[in-house]
């Protein structure tokens, strides 16, 4: 469910929602509850980052761009809290229109707040948990979908290798078939 503050998130959790999309304005108490109950959060912070920078180009008035900046900052501040609380944080794709090419910018944006391995895990094993597809995606294992990328460098040292629409990926394999390389 796409939710931002405690009132909405609490209501959704009480109703059985298992994954909060965004959650930019959730409190420490709500983060603790999500961690305790084993629920997931998919922040997709890059959406707010790009809208804060390009919102005027998309026709948003200055007041909306300012509000988005506040929401962006709040969401980024939550990343470390979610990580330290042990919340499963997935990697989302909630971008619209012309912003979609910026999706992979989420890697470097999160990397400013989290260890690289946690950022990569959010797009692999944690994303699989969010989608209830553990062992099928986000893993190199017998019976998994065999979606793999070969990266030109070490993304644990440089998360930007995972950005720019595959520019640093000489080989991309999906479902066991080479799509690039």
Per-region residue spans from a language model:
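Glycine-centered positions in the ABC transporter ATPase nucleotide-binding domain
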Residues: 175-176
